[in-house]
């Protein structure tokens, strides 16, 4: 306890206890924070005695800083505490933790700039993975397993979508041809795509050999041979030769050249894996403009065209392939509108309010079409006729003429139209009484039968007709003539 408490004393301890944990906060650093920091250093297998000097704090900072991205909250708190303690030893007069961290970052940036400037003055390349060792020699550091794992994960998750190319470019920064071949060899699947990539590399290597022919005669002593296309691809050159080419004077950036060939092949693969043309990207009738823009630029990244052509596609096709609602808005903005202005103007298109407005307009158009169809209907309208006055255009209930007495049908008094016994006219326009034979649209006489009467076999009793029926039948059917004249003596 005593040793840990003796890290600071006197004026430094007073300055330590004045520093705030957070900007504008009430809590301040105390002795217990130093005791906790020394215990944490022991847990991380570091010497707590390093906290007693500014040089020791600087060593702890260099040791802990690479682990901040993946470290726990305790590790970050320990780093912050050591950074504040470092400036207490320096008598820098910091007031809170954030100020100490900002000051530390500023110092590290200045130190890095000085290192890069000194390396540039000496003509030494600092590109990873070729670095300079303590003896001043340029050595190669292999790609870390974490870098290779990130590349394999991108291929597995994204296949060969357009975002694979910038990811490859970032992971292969400063790499040698050997490193680039290592990245390509880690791709397990997609062998058809890898074969396409090899074909592109071979074509570019042959083009390099054509444009850079080998000079006749042996190379001058002390001078390296010029790289061939296969040397740039890493198949006929060693790692040491690649390093010498990349760090020579003048340098030959074989890594960057090979990387450019690979990206050219990846562009062809992305094009194959993204068969959709930019001309086919059109906004759906209910699709939000933001989703349409996302799809448009994703396919545009896969297009093998210059930046000027892509700019023309953006200015022309983005508006041309929008749906009618967005197209109307975009044309009103004019040709000089930025993408931000377009997305802001079309923000509500496709949303609930816009859908309701479009639905209301569609229903209004449908109703107007129905009304026009009704107005154009050429069928005859039903004529309304008044039973009271006999005029057309109104009914009896609305008639202003004096009320007619009696039946509206026959004109007689004593009954209403619903009780009228007068027959209506048939479809021939003739009225027939009910007691004067058959209706006028039926035959008034029947043809006389020529067959003999049916024989009776005694299966049922004959029905005796009534006198009235006989009289009626006598009127309708006159007696038949004798049939003896027809059949002679036939019994």
UniProtKB/Swiss-Prot annotation:
Q: Where is the region PPIA/CYPA-binding loop?
A: 213-221
Q: How is it modified after translation?
A: Gag-Pol polyprotein: Specific enzymatic cleavages by the viral protease yield mature proteins.
Q: Superkingdom of the source?
A: Viruses
Q: Where is this motif: LYPX(n)L motif?
A: 476-486
Q: One cellular component GO annotation, for this chain's record?
A: host cell nucleus
Report the residue ranges where the short sequence motif PTAP/PSAP motif is annotated in this entry: 449-452
Chain positions of site Cleavage: 128-129, 359-360, 371-372, 426-427, 442-443
Identify the Pfam families for this entry. Gag_p17, Gag_p24_C, Gag_p6, zf-CCHC
Motif Nuclear localization signal mapped to chain = 26-32
- Annotated region Dimerization/Multimerization of capsid protein p24: the residues are 273-359
Could you tell me which residues belong to the region Interaction with membrane phosphatidylinositol 4,5-bisphosphate?
73-77
Lipid attachment of type N-myristoyl glycine occurs at which residues? 2
Under which name does UniProt file this protein? Gag polyprotein
Species the sequence originates in = Human immunodeficiency virus type 1 group M subtype F1 (isolate VI850)
């Amino acid at each position: 306890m005593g040793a840990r408490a003796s890290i600071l004393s006197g004026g430094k301890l007073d300055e330590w206890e004045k520093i705030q944990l957070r900007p504008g906060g009430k809590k301040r650093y105390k002795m217990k924070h130093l005791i906790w920091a020394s215990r944490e250093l022991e847990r991380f297998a570091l010497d707590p005695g390093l906290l007693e000097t500014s040089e020791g704090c600087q060593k702890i900072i260099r040791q802990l800083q690479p682990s901040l991205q993946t470290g726990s909250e305790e590790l970050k708190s320990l780093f912050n505490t050591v950074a504040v303690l470092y400036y207490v030893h320096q008598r820098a007069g910091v007031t809170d933790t954030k100020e100490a961290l900002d000051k530390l970052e500023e110092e590290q940036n200045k130190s890095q700039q000085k290192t890069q400037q000194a390396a540039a003055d000496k003509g030494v390349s600092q590109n990873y993975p070729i670095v300079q060792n303590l003896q001043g020699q340029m050595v190669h550091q292999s790609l870390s397993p974490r870098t290779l794992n990130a590349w394999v994960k991108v291929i597995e998750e994204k296949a060969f979508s357009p975002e694979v190319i910038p990811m490859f470019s970032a992971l292969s920064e400063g790499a040698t041809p050997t490193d680039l071949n290592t990245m390509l060899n880690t791709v397990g699947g997609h062998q058809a795509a890898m074969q396409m990539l090899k074909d592109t590399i071979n074509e570019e290597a042959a083009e390099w050999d054509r444009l850079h022919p080998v000079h006749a005669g042996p190379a001058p002593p002390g001078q390296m041979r010029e790289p061939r296309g296969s040397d740039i691809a890493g198949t006929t050159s060693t790692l040491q030769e690649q390093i010498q080419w990349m760090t020579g004077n003048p340098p030959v950036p074989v890594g960057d050249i090979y990387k450019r060939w690979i990206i050219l092949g990846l562009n062809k693969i992305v094009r194959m894996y993204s068969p959709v043309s930019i001309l086919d990207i059109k906004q759906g009738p209910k699709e939000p403009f933001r989703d349409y823009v996302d799809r448009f630029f994703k396919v545009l990244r896969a297009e093998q065209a210059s930046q000027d052509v892509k700019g023309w596609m953006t200015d022309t096709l983005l508006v041309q392939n929008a749906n009618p609602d967005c197209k109307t808005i975009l044309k009103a903005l004019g040709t000089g509108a930025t993408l931000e202005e377009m997305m802001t103007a079309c923000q509500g298109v496709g949303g609930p309010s816009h859908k309701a407005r479009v639905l209301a307009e569609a229903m209004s158009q449908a109703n107007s079409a129905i009304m026009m169809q009704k107005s154009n209907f050429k069928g005859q309208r039903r004529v309304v006729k008044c039973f009271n006055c006999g005029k057309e255009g109104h009914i009896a209930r609305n008639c202003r003429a004096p009320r007619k007495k009696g039946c509206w049908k026959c004109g007689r008094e004593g009954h209403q139209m619903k009780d009228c016994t007068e027959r209506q006219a048939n479809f021939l326009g003739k009225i027939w009484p009910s007691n004067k034979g058959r209706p006028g649209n039926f035959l008034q006489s029947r043809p006389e039968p020529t067959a003999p009467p049916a024989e009776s076999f005694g299966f049922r009793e004959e029905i005796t007709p009534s006198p009235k029926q006989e009289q009626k039948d006598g009127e309708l059917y006159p007696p038949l003539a004798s049939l003896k004249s027809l059949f002679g003596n036939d019994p």
